[in-house]
A protein has these predicted regions:
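Nucleic-acid endonuclease domains
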Residues: 1-171
């Protein structure tokens, strides 16, 4: 029997994802939000013209989870149609953006697919959550830095004040 995701975990995941999308929209106000179908089937959250980007929240520099298979056992987001993956990374002051194709190739070359391991041992090895058909691996920020496309897009440092709409600056 498959277990569902707890309400608390789903809520935390939604909040962190929602925060990442809010930050992304502030960095790229011209980006067009994808449709629900594009998000689910193409793994694209935003469009910049004909270039798709998949935004990932809830990451740490020493814990970046890459989905090889989703919870249904289907190809994960690293095999999606987005051109870029944007990892929300507050420790870097913005989004770490890499080519999805480069990340996929990095995983092909460096991730050991031969056996499943426990979560604590999942660095460049495969892990599957209990009662799920997913396959994920853990990378770290230094791994992403080796990709030629690696770039950090700083967070937007301004916002509109709710009283009057004056432009305010964070720093």
């Amino acid at each position: 029997m498959k277990r569902g995701v707890s309400v608390a975990r789903r809520s935390k995941s939604w909040r962190s994802g929602n925060l990442a999308t809010t930050r992304y929209e502030r960095c790229y106000p011209e980006a067009r939000k994808s449709s629900r179908a594009e998000d689910i089937f193409m793994h694209i959250d935003y469009w910049h013209g004909d270039i798709g980007v998949d935004v990932k929240g809830n990451n740490l520099p020493d814990e970046i989870w890459v989905e090889l298979k989703n919870v249904r056992g289907e190809p994960g987001w690293v095999f999606g149609e987005a051109r870029y993956i944007a990892f929300d990374m507050p420790e870097c002051g913005g989004f770490v953006i890499v080519s999805r194709e480069e990340l996929k190739e990095y995983c092909r070359l460096h991730v050991d697919l031969s056996e499943l391991v426990q979560k604590k041992d999942a660095y460049k090895r495969c892990y599957s959550r209990k009662d799920r058909d997913d396959l994920i691996t853990k990378l770290v920020l230094e791994d992403l830095r080796t990709l030629p496309s690696y770039v950090v897009k700083p967070y937007c440092n301004s916002y509109s004040h709710p009283d009057g709409g004056d432009k305010m600056y964070v720093s």
